[in-house]
Amino acid sequence: MSNPRTKSPNTNRGQGLRSERSALLNDSLSSLNGNSSYDSIKDSSKNNKDVAEVNEYPRRPESSVSVVSNSPHRQDAATTNTVSTVSVSKVLPALLLGVVLAALDNTIVASTYTKIGAEFGKFSQVSWTATAYMISCTAFQPLFGKFCDIYGRKKTLLAAYCVFGIGCFLCGTSRSLWQLVAARAIAGIGGGGMNSTVSILMSDIVPLKQRGTYQGIINVFFAIGSSLGGPVGGYFADQYTWRIGFLIQVPLIAIAFLCVYFTLNLPHHNHVSFMTRFRKIDLKGLILLIIGVTTMTCAFTLGGNVREWNDPVVISLLIASSISYLSFVYVEAFVAFEPLAPMDVLTERTCLSSYLCNFFHSVANFGWIYGMPLFFQSIKNEGAEKSGIRLIPMIIGSSLGSLLGGAVISLTGNYKKITVGSYFFGSVAALFMLRYGYSNFNWEYAVYPFSGGLGNGIAVTTTLVAIIHASPSAFQASAIATSYLFRSNGCVLGVSISSSIVQTVLGIKLRKSLDFDVDELLHHLRKDISYVHRLPEEIRQTVLDALLGSIHYSFLFVSFMFFCAFVCSMFIKNRNL
């Protein structure tokens, strides 16, 4: 049996803990030897069963559990635990339905937040409906990766479906903005669990060289859900009420639950009590992560919007966030026996580079999703439905990019070159969006978002394959969940920072352009952005120009984030599959 990394005799406490975990891992694998659930998968394939029997444990038997070697031609252990194409085809539709709904719920607020803000009279605070979803999604995704190890893939996925459905129902029945924010947080927990668990499950049943293709398919359906979120939410908001957009998801998620329950048959764990398994969860790390994500988001939401950046509250939140994140890293490295984000993964060069790429391109992507509807609803005076439709070219580009990235990996076995090129492409596309408001060519409203989406879609697929290829097999579930942690952190900051940039720059420009106190004007604009078109004609154009300039700064920020991802992608090791 291949042993995990051996440590020097002069190890610190954290290294000792990791060695102890590795020893326990070897013992558990030895006990599973000869009775592996991976063997049952191969037997089920031979018997031509039409259900996917997937190992509930992510840890491979002897020859499969190994740390990534320096050789670029590491044996693909996953090829030993695949199921037939027929079996995958039975399971995949049930998984994809959940992916579509999670993606739809992720973007449904993008085209409805003006309606929600107007109904509750709190436009400046309505961005919390998006950030609350992302906070909970971010904080709990690593936990779902650990749940997959402890309770198994199927139970974890079904639990995520239940939490998501409850959250959607509460969203549709909320009677105040803060009730809606709390409901969005509940939905975010389930949505994050659905996304990460599906990727972990597919990683178990698909060979490494084909994972790019299957991940591309998953990303396409995620893109379909994302593209539907804006138009569907905008349509219901314009024609009926924004609440229907949330309530309609409840019966659909129930269908997904039933499909997974009946089509995904998995071997059972050895019988261990719930509390025995629960004690394995890194609660200290989880609490620190929740505090870090929440305080960081609060700081960027309040700063430049409700409070000045030098306000003691904003500064305190930034300090608290920094301390929480540093403490989280310390706990994961030196305290946690079963860490949410293992250091064996975080310290691997390709994994870390890919994680940073995921973070930066997620910041860029959600900054884009925030900025585009704002541009069309404020500058172009379009309705929520039409501004949501404007997001479709970007989503189509992302879908095609995911398939292209997977196809290139399957054909060439190389993922670095196309990753580097995709981020450069996205950065340039975002720069061209600075022409918005000055150009009279309507095709530019589609081509630039499509190009940026294409680059983003390629990178989402290729970086995940890089992480799977580079991570130790025993920690693959945690490695995948950690990638979603970095993505979700980026999504939270993408919305919050973009909103803060627009609000801050708008205030600066208006104070320079107008010769009266603009605080009341800013107050009205923050409550309802469409107020700009009800202003007196003599100041309306001045305010529109200031608003356009502030949105351009958010697009410039998007371009810079893509460039940061481009730089990080240069450090990914070029291992051919």
Curated annotation (Swiss-Prot):
GO terms for biological process: asparagine transmembrane import into vacuole; basic amino acid transport; isoleucine transmembrane transport; L-lysine transmembrane import into vacuole; transmembrane transport. Residues 40-62 have a biased composition (Basic and acidic residues). GO terms for cellular component: cytoplasm; fungal-type vacuole; fungal-type vacuole membrane. The chain crosses the membrane at residues 91-111, 123-145, 157-177, 186-206, 217-237, 244-264, 286-306, 317-337, 356-376, 391-411, 418-438, 448-468, 490-510, 547-567. It is a multi-pass membrane protein. Keywords: Membrane, Transmembrane, Transmembrane helix, Transport, Vacuole. The keyword Transmembrane helix applies. GO terms for molecular function: basic amino acid transmembrane transporter activity; L-asparagine transmembrane transporter activity; L-isoleucine transmembrane transporter activity; L-lysine transmembrane transporter activity. Residues 1-80 are annotated as: Disordered. InterPro entries: MFS, MFS_dom, MFS_trans_sf. Pfam families: MFS_1. It is found in: Vacuole; Membrane. MFS-type transporter involved in vacuolar amino acid uptake. Belongs to the major facilitator superfamily. This is Vacuolar membrane amino acid uptake transporter fnx2. The lineage of its organism: Eukaryota, Fungi, Dikarya, Ascomycota, Taphrinomycotina. The gene is fnx2.
